[in-house]
Amino acid sequence: MSRNTATQFVAVLAAAAMGVYSLLVLGATTSLTGAASACQTWPSCNGQWFALQSLDLVVVWGHRTAAALTGLAVVGAAVLAWRTGASRRVRTAVTLALALYPVQVVIGAYTAMSAGAAPFTGVHLTLGVGIFASLVVALAWTLDAQTGDLPSAEWEGEPRHTDDGDPTQPGIVRAYVQLMKPRLMWLLCLVAGAGMALASSQLGAGQQLSAATVVLTLGGGVLSIGASGTFNHVLEREQDEKMARTDDRPVVTDRIPPRNALAFGVVLGVASLAAFAAVNLLTAVLGLTAIAFYSIVYTLVLKPNTRQSTVIGGAAGALPALIGWVAVTGAVGVGGVVLAGVIFLWTPAHFYNLALAYKDDYERGGFPLMPVVEGEAKTRRHIVYYIGATLASAVVLAELTGLGPLYAATTVLLGAVFLYFAIRLHRERDRRAAMRSFHASNAYLGCLLVAVVLDTMVV
């Protein structure tokens, strides 16, 4: 297939996938479910076509129009798959999506006429996720077929240092701050904040989220992240010395002796547990689990020994969601678990970009990450898989927690941006493309978490 045809096929596949995704999100959030009662007939609304007398009817007709346009995109993807000689597995996946789409439309019609009855809604959502998954898998396979055998661009020199701190200004305070990995704090605190916001919506009449709970939980989170980062600096100091990206870290350069760093980590850990315990005991237990998992299970067991360290290690980033939820409710709940699932699935789609950008560095450090042991093509393919899984889990979160239009718009628009940069990564295959995709992943999750907080507590 020609380059132009290949590019066109990828564009249509991506458009079809994101079209299906937008329908899923709109249907799962209150932006559609709240409007469904305004139109309980199909295909017209109470005998009228394109009646737009209210915002609810605008939402309904917008959804139905988008469904028609998305259907055309799915048909276009199927036609191109067969006409361009795509692989058998790609044709199978796209044809499956095409076959299921009319079924999805019929179930959607019954859902509308039954005023969103639970059985129809559940089947409608499940089938929609299946169609979306088929298109995402087809997209990943297509990109792999088009670019998997092509060489990656040569890296332009040694990677720049990305940790906080300036080796030309080795102030002791700066060095201790660097130990705490402050660049991780904003996003992980947002995760905990989103967990608290979701949990606050479950509180009964007369109950509300207190400022003390927020301060203690986020303060404990900052301290626990600092403790985990400090222990990581100490335990990985020999590997860090071999890597250009990390050979300026405080323990490696002996600005802070390992013994002092270890003591600092212990102080931070104890302080974090004290803050969490002031909220409730289960929050403290989860905080201790997070520190131990990152410092011991991930750093000592997973990262040096298995290419699946990124996937399994995602649990460390997911735990703040549970910590935030438990801080408010005192117990683990479904909303907190699903939010943690979103973070868990996002982690490989996020970190694999960094692993690609610094593949040679990680190889020098002796870390068997996926790009090192399985190759760059497979890693890029898995980034697309995990983007799809992350977006699907975000739909489940909306369905179970009643999030609204701000959340819907954020996950669709930023999800499309994330996918776009992953596609560019396949085309360009260099460090800059990997870092653009990495930053897009941060933007997606950061904006999504802010939307959760605003949709739950403000809008």
Curated annotation (Swiss-Prot):
Q: Which pathway features in its UniProt record?
A: Porphyrin-containing compound metabolism; heme O biosynthesis; heme O from protoheme: step 1/1
Cellular compartments annotated: Cell membrane
Q: What is its main location?
A: membrane
| Annotated region described as Protoheme IX prenyltransferase, given as residue ranges | 185-459
Reactions the enzyme catalyzes: heme b + (2E,6E)-farnesyl diphosphate + H2O = Fe(II)-heme o + diphosphate
Region called Unknown, residue ranges? 1-184
For membrane topology, the record states: Multi-pass membrane protein
A single GO CC term for this protein reads: plasma membrane
Q: Transmembrane residues, as ranges?
A: 9-29, 66-86, 93-113, 123-143, 184-204, 211-231, 262-282, 284-304, 325-345, 382-402, 403-423, 438-458
GO BP terms: namely: heme O biosynthetic process
EC no. given is 2.5.1.141
Tell me more from the record. Carbon 2 of the heme B porphyrin ring is defined according to the Fischer nomenclature.
Q: Which family does it belong to?
A: In the C-terminal section; belongs to the UbiA prenyltransferase family. Protoheme IX farnesyltransferase subfamily.
Record function comment = Converts heme B (protoheme IX) to heme O by substitution of the vinyl group on carbon 2 of heme B porphyrin ring with a hydroxyethyl farnesyl side group.
Name assigned to this protein: Protoheme IX farnesyltransferase
- Which taxonomic lineage is given here? Archaea, Methanobacteriati, Methanobacteriota, Stenosarchaea group, Halobacteria
